[in-house]
Design a protein with these regions (language model features):
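Cytosolic, membrane-proximal regulatory domains of ion/volume homeostasis and mechanosensation machinery
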Residues: 38-40, 45-74
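Aspartyl protease catalytic core from the pepsin/retropepsin fold
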Residues: 15-31, 65-130
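Generic "edge-of-domain/loop-turn" microfeature
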Residues: 24, 37, 54-55, 99
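Canonical alpha-helical transmembrane segment with a positive-inside/aromatic-interface signature
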Residues: 1-42, 46-49
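Intrinsically disordered, low-complexity segments enriched in polar/charged residues with Gly/Pro
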Residues: 2-7, 34-35, 61, 78-81, ...
Length: 130
């Protein structure tokens, strides 16, 4: 393992997160990303990122979900003027160092692929989540 990989891993903060919508829930691993500052452009609400396959079980059967889609513009390394589509769920519960943090009606941008090539996490938490 090279020095860059070791430094990168040592600075990562992971949390267990529960996503809840309409009585359905999924649990996944999240990366707290100090560089993630996504916001919904109209309200200014913070936005987190989730893999589609992770959130799919809580969205299934919600016919009205398509009517409540948010469009989130973003820029990142290698991607200028990107767009992510987002949804609002009932709550997100973050298990943070022996403490649960409940976020009511969080906005989650949906990413079609894998956020972590090695599967370490399925959610990226906005740097301002707490």
């Amino acid at each position: 393992m090279n020095i860059y990989t070791r430094l990168k891993r040592s600075n990562c903060i992971y949390y267990d997160v529960k996503l809840v919508k309409n009585g359905k829930a999924v649990v996944a691993k999240a990366l707290y990303d100090t560089g993630c500052s996504l916001r919904e452009p109209v309200t200014g609400s913070i936005v987190h990122i989730v893999e589609y396959e992770t959130i799919k079980p809580v969205l299934e059967g919600d016919e009205k979900a398509e009517q409540r889609i948010y469009v989130i513009p973003y820029n990142s390394v290698g991607k200028k003027d990107g767009i992510l589509y987002a949804v609002k769920i009932d709550e997100m519960i973050v298990n943070r160092e022996e403490q649960e943090v409940t976020i009511r009606e969080p906005i989650l941008a949906i990413y079609e692929g894998k956020l972590s090539g090695k599967g370490y996490y399925q959610i990226i938490l906005n740097s301002e989540f707490y």
